UniProtKB/Swiss-Prot annotation:
Signal peptide: none annotated. PANTHER family: MITOCHONDRIAL DNA REPAIR PROTEIN RECA HOMOLOG-RELATED (PTHR45900:SF1), RECA (PTHR45900). GO terms for biological process: DNA recombination; DNA repair; SOS response. One of its GO terms (molecular function) is ATP binding. InterPro entries: AAA+_ATPase, DNA_recomb/repair_RecA, DNA_recomb/repair_RecA_CS, P-loop_NTPase, RecA-like_C, RecA-like_N, RecA_ATP-bd, RecA_C_sf. It comes from Helicobacter hepaticus (strain ATCC 51449 / 3B1). The lineage of its organism: Bacteria, Pseudomonadati, Campylobacterota, Epsilonproteobacteria, Campylobacterales. Its main location: cytoplasm. Belongs to the RecA family. This is Protein RecA.
Length: 345
């Protein structure tokens, strides 16, 4: 027990801090109910489960990284679409100047109400980010990508000039400024990042690293490694990619969980494919030869045909999804990775 004299000193300090910095700047955990962390769905059932809270956490920094064409931007745009469906305001800072508006619309993004910026320099991009964050009106901001946040000095300099560590210092400074504001405004920030190969690893440790220095690794609450693991074909035609997402860092739930899902060309993440994969794995969907069925009702012959049935029958898809979530929740364990799906030939 704290003696009376020290207790009065603490109360006085609390009052002074509240007066100087606002009520709630310093609280006793026992006096404040610990709130459940809000999240934004990723559009992937498996990844939402792997993240532990049903999606990416609000008020935090997220890093999505991986090799080229692995599905990083697609995953980010799916999160934007999910946020907008729930009434959120989203911004996309397109530092790469490569946003495909038509593709974003196909993924379900409300492009009419999406705030888009194509900045000229890294400083401009991060100033826009800070202004949007401090406004308190934006729920989700995506920056594509860290590698494209080129410092002004580098753009205005000559081609052969050396600018060692300039981008890393720029990122470190920006992250120090906005981390607290993001939490206060309950806004989520997603950085899309690329992979580079380290020089001189000599076989020790991973030869891969991400761009922009180490600051983002420390400030990010969640880091997701996205990789393409297989090509999906139908009648010898490539129709999409099988993608694996690994949560390599997670400050809000246990890390190192993985999820696999299909990214279909022109459509994005196949929710129906995940429902089928996890449904079979958990014995919710029956598989007899090539036929798939649920509660004695045939869904179709082959995975792709069953996906079409679920896509056309949303209530049925929602019912199976609810059963999957219920089973996973009751088991209180890491969501099992589904077996690699068979492609319809």
């Amino acid at each position: 027990m704290v003696d009376e004299k020290r207790q009065k000193a603490i109360e006085l300090a609390l009052k002074q801090i509240d007066k100087a910095f606002g009520k709630g700047a310093l609280v006793r955990l026992g006096d404040k109910q610990v709130e459940k962390i809000d999240s934004i769905s990723t559009g992937s059932l498996g990844l939402d489960m792997a993240l532990g809270i049903g999606g990416v956490p609000k008020g935090r920094i997220i890093e999505i990284y991986g090799p080229e064409s692995s599905g990083k931007t697609t995953l980010s745009l799916q999160i934007v679409a999910e946020c907008q469906r729930n009434g959120g305001i989203c911004a996309f800072i397109d530092a790469e100047h490569a946003l495909d508006v038509y593709y974003a619309k196909r993924l379900g993004v409300d492009t009419e109400n999406l705030l888009v910026s194509q900045p000229d320099t890294g400083e401009q991009a991060l100033e826009i980010l800070e202004t949007l964050t401090r406004s308190g009106a934006v729920d989700l901001i995506v920056i594509d990508s860290v590698a494209a946040l080129t410092p002004k000095a580098e753009i205005e300099g000559d081609m052969g000039d050396q600018h060692v560590g300039l981008q890393a210092r720029l990122m470190s400074h920006a992250l120090r400024k906005i981390t607290g504001v993001l939490h206060k405004m309950n806004a989520t920030l997603i950085f899309i990042n690329q992979i580079r190969m380290k020089i001189g690893t000599m076989g020790y440790g991973s030869p891969e690293t991400t761009t922009g220095g180490n600051a983002l690794k420390f400030y990010a609450s969640v880091r997701i490694d996205v990789r393409r693991v297989a090509t999906l074909k139908q009648n010898d035609q490539q129709i999409g990619n099988r993608t694996k997402a690994k949560v390599v860092k997670n400050k809000v739930a246990p890390p190192f969980r993985e999820a696999e899902f299909d990214i279909m060309f022109g459509e994005g993440i196949s929710k129906e494919g995940e429902i089928i994969d996890y449904g079979i794995k958990l014995d919710i969907i029956d598989k007899s030869g090539a036929w798939l069925s649920y509660n004695d009702k045939k869904l179709g012959q082959g995975r792709e045909n069953a996906k079409i049935v679920l896509k056309e029958n949303k209530s049925l898809a929602d019912e199976i999804t609810a059963k999957i979530k219920e089973q996973i929740g009751s088991k209180d364990e890491i969501l099992p990775l589904p077996d690699e799906p068979e492609t319809d030939e």
